[in-house]
UniProtKB/Swiss-Prot annotation:
Citrate synthase is found in nearly all cells capable of oxidative metabolism. Residues 1-30 form a transit peptide. The active site is at residues 303, 349, 404. PROSITE patterns: CITRATE_SYNTHASE. InterPro entries: Citrate_synth-like_lrg_a-sub (IPR016142), Citrate_synth-like_sm_a-sub (IPR016143), Citrate_synthase (IPR002020), Citrate_synthase_AS (IPR019810), Citrate_synthase_euk (IPR010109), Citrate_synthase_sf (IPR036969). This is Citrate synthase, mitochondrial. It is found in: Mitochondrion matrix. Pfam families: Citrate_synt. Its EC number is 2.3.3.1. Disulfide bonds: none annotated. Oxaloacetate binds at residues 358, 430, 450. Belongs to the citrate synthase family. GO terms for biological process: carbohydrate metabolic process; citrate metabolic process; tricarboxylic acid cycle. It comes from Xenopus laevis.
């Protein structure tokens, strides 16, 4: 039994939406190390389950839509099926039912390492099953085998102007990789739609494999005078190869990267990057085009650039107030920020109503590896002070820190000071989640997304007719 069925069975039995069955060993079911073979077994069962569910409940009403929802970015509107993760307002993200602490405990790790390997999370997101070490090793070697970039993409990256933002370079390079798309080629030749998922799987595996090379090349070109990224080592895991290509050899930084790439991978389906990938993919655009579009969304200040804005604000705070700051001075500074009409970056979330568990696991990493770092101390001090001020102000629905409040500080500590680049790391990680879902979207035959739009006059008439 996979998570896809086991989690729901457990929830029904125990009457809980997040049951202790998240730790059931039976979800480590498949013995094959070939991910595609495992999927080939899972997909027909899930197709049948959903077909039966739709036949029985296809006309069932699952919620109401208000005028505020329509004008408010569709917040809270139930309108997407997204299998790989669910965001609970109180508990935070669950990857196929597993919390971040559970993933840290259960997913395989590198020899001598303590953080989960992103390869293991990808296996979990795709299959719903916790992989064993052999399955994770298979993914690592498979991605190493697929990692080489075509020459035209290398030439393209080497000729970008240095004032072109790293995210623009990432998006353009991913789009150019579309020349390698198995899906686009087969679709043009009239492939049967039952084969769509297999082609999307191949493209997704290729793209994830190549992303560290693209991202490292951007970094080297912009910040390391165009020095070589070197070669992929098939004996190393995905994160280790990535940090080596970036030019970092500290194994603590590699451990941080494993954690970072794991926790930023997915955040259910309604956020801008995940929804964009789903929307563009629903037009049967190939994974390269779908993911490139997602990266353009991630580049927005309200999505992936937030961690950069946090660090800019922290640096400005340090410059204004000096080294060690008293709690009283910090409170005054925060109130001045709020009273000037600005927000405290890194606090609040559209869905979460508690401290983001992605913040918590980064805090725990810092407490273990860099407890005396001045910037970390400042972040920890803010954690004690900011929520109470936001509650006192009375405007924030969620006064607690999110993932962006911490990640930049950790990267800075290990020497990655180039803030413009941070969202590229976020993008590399996000591929694990949105491409896992893209495989399933094609496997389940999800149609072209086409919601109904209305004008303000039309809404007013509708409301008038309903209230009349």
């Amino acid at each position: 039994m996979s998570l896809i069925s086991a989690g729901r069975v457990c929830a029904r039995i125990l009457g809980a939406k997040n049951s202790p069955c998240a730790l059931i060993a039976a979800r480590q079911a498949s013995s094959s190390t070939n991910l595609k073979d495992v999927l080939s077994d899972l997909i027909p069962k899930e197709q049948t389950r959903i077909k039966n569910f739709k036949q029985q409940h296809g006309k069932t009403v699952i919620g109401q839509v208000t005028v505020d929802m329509v004008y408010g970015g569709m917040r809270g509107m139930k309108g997407l099926v997204y299998e790989t993760s669910v965001l609970d307002p109180d508990e935070g993200i669950r990857f196929r039912g597993y919390s971040i602490p559970e993933c840290q405990k259960l997913l395989p790790k590198a020899p001598g390492g303590e953080e989960p390997l992103p390869e293991g999370l990808f296996w979990l997101l795709v299959t719903g099953e916790v992989p064993n070490q052999d399955q994770v090793n298979w993914i690592s070697k498979e991605w190493a085998k697929r990692a080489a970039l075509p020459s035209h993409v290398v030439t393209m990256l080497d000729n970008f102007p240095t004032n072109l933002h790293p995210m623009s370079q990432l998006s353009a390079a991913i789009t150019a990789l579309n020349s390698e798309s198995n899906f686009a080629r087969a679709y043009a030749e009239g492939v049967n739609k039952a084969k769509y998922w297999e082609l999307v799987y191949e493209d997704s595996m290729d793209l994830i494999a190549k992303l560290p090379c693209v991202a490292a090349k951007i970094y080297r070109n912009l910040y390391r005078e165009g020095s070589s990224i070197g070669a992929i080592d098939s004996n190393l895991d995905w994160s280790d190869n990535f940090t080596n290509m970036l030019g970092y050899t500290d194994q603590q930084f590699t451990e941080l990267m494993r954690l970072y790439l794991t926790i930023h991978s997915d955040h259910e389906g309604g956020n801008v990057s995940a929804h964009t990938s789903h929307l563009v993919g629903s037009a049967l655009s190939d994974p390269y085009l779908s993911f490139s579009a997602a990266m353009n969304g991630l580049a927005g200040p309200l999505h992936g650039l937030a961690n950069q804005e946090v660090l800019v604000w922290l640096t400005s705070l340090q410059k204004d107030l000096g080294g060690e700051v008293s709690d009283e001075k910090l409170r005054d500074y925060i109130w001045n920020t709020l009273n000037s009409g600005r927000v405290v970056p890194g606090y609040g979330h559209a869905v979460l109503r508690k401290t983001d568990p992605r913040y918590t696991c980064q805090r725990e990493f810092a407490l273990k590896h860099l407890p005396d770092d001045p910037m970390f101390k400042l972040v920890a001090q803010l954690y004690k002070i900011v929520p109470n001020i936001l509650l006192e102000q009375g405007k924030a629905k969620n006064p607690w820190p999110n993932v962006d409040a911490h990640s930049g500080v950790l990267l800075q500590y290990y020497g990655m000071t180039e803030m413009n680049y941070y969202t590229v790391l976020f993008g590399v990680s996000r591929a694990l989640g949105v491409l896992s879902q893209l495989i399933w979207s094609r496997a389940l035959g999800f149609p072209l997304e086409r919601p109904k739009s209305m004008s303000t006059d039309g809404l007013m008439q509708l409301v008038g007719s309903k209230s009349g």
